[in-house]
Amino acid sequence: MPTQPILVASIADGTGKTAVTLALARLVQERDRRVGYMKPKGTRLQSSTGKTLDRDPMLARDLLGLDGEMHQLEPVVYSPTFVDSAIRGQEDPDELGDLVESQFRELATDTDLMLVEGGGDWTTGGIVDLTDVDVADRLDATVLLVAPYRTAEDLDNVLAAADAFGDRLAGVLFNDVSDAAFDELESDAVPFLERRGVPVVGVLPHDRDLAGVTVGDLTAELGADVLVGGDTDGHIERFLVGAMGGDAALRYFRRTKDAAVVTGGDRPEIVTAALEAPGVNAVILTGGHRPPAAVLGTAENRGVPVLLATGDTLSVVDRAESILESGRARDAGTVDRMRDLLYDHADVDAILSGDDAASDADE
């Protein structure tokens, strides 16, 4: 018999939920247990039409060697088209909930533990009664809540989610915690939550390998043209908009690291300033303009990639931020790194306690 499923929910999109879910699945497999995976609401789509699939279940199927079909792993494609249909009364919440349950039962066959990944944040799906709270109730799942932490004010959201999940909450896992916030979280915030009856099962530090996106991945996601090649493994954690004068831009750019500068191709002085800043790992040009050949030559000499993306600066920044905030687990390497972080900084036995009990019963 499978043990009680674990639903991995998150306070906000882009908190590393997919990496955590898949890393836990790998840990279960390393214990010689049979694991299953499901993401009831597909939210990370390649298009907004609902005709494409969520990338997370596709990655899960490949990494975990699962046999389930995509319509089982992701029964509800939560696209803008679907949302529009739902608010017009064209989607039946009861039928959708029953669909999730039936696909879950099929996937759970011959598994020891099912891991269920929430979609978006924990409130996503409310228009069709499929929030993570609703899904946990339907599947009788315990809940691991993945949360960010920057300041103590973030605890308001944690407490609200903990109250909504109630007794189903197995624990909170803080992820991607900066050095500046780490001590305060461990010394003050964690004891506060535990006094309020909210268990904390881990605090994972910021890890460069899991944050941001590589220049190569960003280029592919944006569909950008490469004007100047360079270090495609360069790391991007933030985007800076170049809209000021050259001198001011240089002072601005020098205060950052692991950044990409987004600016119009008709602003060569901004591009030049970006190329002089050691923390800028790429320049993204917009508006269909190319800078002078001399500027591109400087970029080539410095090994800084220069990309040309379709659209104006605002739209390109929005798309780039969306890529960055997806927090996606890109490959086996990122999942394995998350597994190591869980080993070092989380109580894995507490998270997987139901599966351990099942394993002991089988022996």
Please describe what each predicted stretch is.
Residues G120-G202, D266-G303, L307-I323, G327-A329:
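Conserved catalytic-core segment of NTP-binding enzymes
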Residues P5-L7, R34-G36, M58, M70-H71, ...:
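Structural motif
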Residues V83-V128, V133-D137:
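Phosphate-binding/switch loop-helix module in NTP-utilizing enzymes
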Residues S10-A12, L24, P40-K41, R55-D56, ...:
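Fold-independent oxyanion-binding glycine-rich loops
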Residues P5-T15, A19-E106, A181-D183, A189-R195:
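N-terminal phosphate/diphosphate-binding loop that engages ATP/GTP or pyrophosphate donors
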Residues M1-T3, E363:
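Terminal disorder- and signal-encoded targeting elements
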Residues P5-V8, D98-G118, V241-G245, A249-R254, ...:
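P-loop NTP-binding module
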Residues G171, N175-V271, L275, R328-E363:
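C-terminal accessory "lid"/substrate-recognition subdomains
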